[in-house]
């Protein structure tokens, strides 16, 4: 995964891209918690992207009971079933087998990519991804990174981008789980993802309220 400048971006046509209010990259415990929390607040136009062929991450591999989330301990696969049922009941879109290769922060002329969409300037991130069918593009107003521990290079790039975003007065990039703190346990990652999902969800709802939706 590479964070790139939009100066180097060859803009795809709007009809070649998928537009969402919220993009969550990573379908592990923190990503599932994040998009579930946002959906619970009423965010409907969201999309979860996972590079593996199934959701769950550590929840599908770990066998140790998880404590600290509920009154009693739960098995990882029980928690995964809980999230899967939530996504189904709330009809939360998600795609597997999607590997995000490049992330672009849209600014200046690059925002013209959303010229056919309402509120074009609200779209902040473009993701170039690889699937079995080929390359595709995802564009979102907010981006949650829940991809596990970042490499040192990725961590520096994300930190720099977050600092750059602060200048806009409206941050739209949010690391969660092990992307935020590599040593997080499953319970901590779920809590982190849920907190980030609520923060982003509340931000998007406030914006819609201001626009009269």
Residue map of PLM features:
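Residues forming the flavin
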Residues: 1-213
């Amino acid at each position: 995964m590479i964070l790139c400048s939009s100066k180097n971006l060859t803009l795809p046509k709007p009809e070649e891209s998928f537009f969402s209010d919220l993009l969550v990259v990573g379908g592990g415990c923190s990503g599932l918690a994040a998009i579930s929390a946002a959906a619970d607040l009423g965010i409907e136009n969201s999309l979860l992207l996972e590079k593996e062929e199934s959701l769950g991450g550590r929840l599908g591999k770990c066998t140790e009971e998880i404590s600290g989330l509920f009154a009693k301990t739960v098995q990882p696969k029980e928690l995964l079933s809980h999230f899967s049922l939530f996504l189904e009941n709330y009809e939360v879109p998600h795609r597997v087998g999607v590997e995000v290769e490049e992330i672009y922060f849209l600014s200046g002329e690059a925002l013209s990519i959303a010229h056919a969409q309402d509120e074009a300037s609200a779209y902040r991130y473009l993701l170039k991804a690889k699937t079995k069918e080929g390359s595709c593009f995802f564009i979102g107003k907010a981006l949650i990174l829940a991809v596990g521990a970042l490499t040192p290079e990725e961590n520096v790039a994300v930190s720099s981008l977050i600092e750059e975003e602060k200048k806009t007065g409206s941050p739209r990039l949010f690391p969660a789980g092990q992307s935020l703190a590599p040593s997080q346990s499953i319970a901590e990652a779920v809590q982190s993802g849920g907190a980030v999902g609520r923060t982003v969800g509340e931000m998007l709802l406030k914006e819609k309220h201001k626009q009269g939706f």
